[in-house]
Swiss-Prot record:
Alphabetical list of SUPFAM superfamilies matching this protein: Adenine nucleotide alpha hydrolases-like, Argininosuccinate synthetase, C-terminal domain
EC number: 6.3.4.5
Main localization of the protein described in the UniProt heading: cytoplasm
UniProt xrefs under PANTHER family: ARGININOSUCCINATE SYNTHASE
Subunit organization: Homotetramer.
Native source organism of the sequence: Pseudomonas paraeruginosa (strain DSM 24068 / PA7)
Protein name in UniProt: Argininosuccinate synthase
């Protein structure tokens, strides 16, 4: 292990990564640089600085990445209407490429020869972090302590921390029974009673959203302005990407929007139950499809829908920096040139209802689509030839006696 002189650690300041910090120092006899990302998780990140300093860390990075996260990762993903396995809005998955990118940048800045993370050997995050790291710095060494050590329970971690003088709170405030991960897009819950797929989640688990039953009895109306597929204003007020998502989380949470309880297929092979709150993302998905419905050509819209599951899978499995994801992104972004306009939504007790959409780039032609007299805008007699031509192959098959059953 003498080949490792300096390691950049993705550090939260919690029990797991604090133990990892000390374990790296002792096991590899190396210098550790800590990196703490503020992705809008809602927790104070500065205590991580004090804890790292107390453990002898000299180079400490605490970065506010909220704007970059939403602008360069969340927004591009939502241009594709991305959903994994029909439901999951990829709140955890989309944060990992940015963390990997910043780990490598700091490694380059500090001359570190390795990076380290606290993802376990059972989950997807180890794959996401490491695929990103290798794509951005092929020769980097990655240290994943959960795949090396025998500290495989919380109690063993606590004992290690006490033995090595790592500041912890064994008898502090009550710890959540769930494993949680949060950023500006979502908060996730795993473990505890959720490991029984028949057991209903507890109401007090949810942190961001009101229950639909207790949400306001009066609906909330909002208008979202789109420019090239991205939201740039709410109710006419221009906002940055992070401000947009923060406000949508707030108003969506009040109205009980964005709760999800699913069993998903992890990349490593197992099924895992997770509960998610994604109020802002749920609103964004509904609104984006609405503005696309009047601005996208039919075949472009259908092609996007065909490509989306593959795009979603690439993000879920950690291939954000792959050539195929980058290729798909160029196609998706090209489709958004005319996705401009305003969507009006009604938020009510867990529901997002589209009640209006308008655009100077709209392909909706009321003169042609009307059920009333159209003044010759559309010749209905043209449909006869259209139908006969499209039926030709089936007519030929029928004349040949081909069976239809």
């Amino acid at each position: 292990m003498a080949d490792v002189k300096k390691v950049v650690l993705a550090y939260s300041g919690g029990l797991d990564t604090s133990v990892i910090l000390k374990w790296l120092q002792d096991t590899y006899n190396c210098e550790v640089v800590t990196f703490t990302a503020d992705l809008g998780q809602g927790e104070e990140v500065e205590p991580a600085r004090a804890k790292a300093r107390a453990m002898g860390v000299r180079e400490i990075y605490i970065d506010d990445l909220r704007e970059e996260f939403v602008r360069d990762f969340v927004y591009p993903m939502f241009r594709a209407n991305t959903v994994y396995e029909g439901e999951y809005l990829l709140g955890t998955s989309i944060a990992r490429p940015l963390i990997a990118k910043r780990l490598i940048e700091i490694a380059n800045e500090t001359g570190a020869d390795a990076i380290s993370h606290g993802a376990t050997g059972k989950g997807n995050d180890q794959v996401r972090f490491e695929l990103g790291a290798y794509a951005l710095k092929p020769g980097v060494k990655v240290i994943a302590p959960w795949r090396e050590w025998d500290l495989l329970s919380r109690e063993k971690l606590m004992d290690y921390a006490e033995k090595h003088g790592i500041p912890i709170e064994r008898h502090g405030k009550k710890k959540s029974p769930y494993s949680m991960d949060a950023n500006l897009l979502h908060i996730s819950y795993e473990g505890g009673v959720l490991e029984d797929t028949w057991t209903e989640h507890e109401e007090d688990m949810w942190k961001w959203t009101a229950s639909p039953e207790s949400a306001p009895d009066a609906p909330t109306y909002i208008e979202l302005t789109y420019r090239k597929g991205d939201i740039v204003a709410i109710d006419g007020k221009e906002m940055t990407p992070a401000q947009v998502l923060t406000e949508l989380n707030r108003v969506g949470g009040i109205n009980g929007i964005g709760r999800l309880d699913i069993v998903e297929n992890r990349y490593v092979g197992m099924k895992s139950r997770g509960c998610y709150e994604t109020p802002g993302g749920t609103i964004m998905l509904k609104a984006h499809r609405a503005i696309e419905s009047i601005t996208l050509d039919r075949e472009v819209a259908h092609l996007k829908d065909e490509l989306m599951p593959k795009y979603a899978s690439l993000i879920y499995t950690g291939y954000w920096w792959s050539p195929e994801r980058l290729m798909l992104q160029q196609m998706i972004d090209a489709s958004q040139v005319n996705v401009n306009g305003v969507v009006r939504l009604k938020l009510y007790k867990g529901n997002v209802v589209v009640v209006g959409r308008k655009s100077d780039d709209s392909l909706f032609d009321a003169n042609i689509a009307t059920f009333e007299e159209d003044g010759g805008a559309y010749n209905q007699a043209d449909a006869a030839g259209f139908i006969k031509l499209n039926a030709l192959r089936m007519r030929i098959a029928a004349n040949k006696g081909r069976s239809l059953s």
